[in-house]
Amino acid sequence: MLATFTIIPIGAGESISPIVAKVVKLVDSSNLDYRLTAMGTIVEGEWDEVLTLIKKAHKLVRRHSARVLTSITIDDRKGAKNRLAGKVDSVKSKLKIEVKS
């Protein structure tokens, strides 16, 4: 499954990149395939491992902020593998333009 998640520490100030960096380090250590985007992180893996990772990330941010907003979008397709790159490649193969990804 794929999951896109965004964790926002409320009241942590204008720049949250130091906290985001800690989350990315946690995600990277999970050994799950992921992509960091400007607005969130996309992770690919099995249900339990992905949700466990997001829970750990939420708790990590919660240690730095009294209030945290976490948004999760899940795409769960039976039998699908390597969708993190595969979904993008599928769209690129149908276009006749260079796509930024």
Identify the meaning behind each predicted range.
Residues M1-S101:
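Charge-rich, low-complexity N-terminal segments
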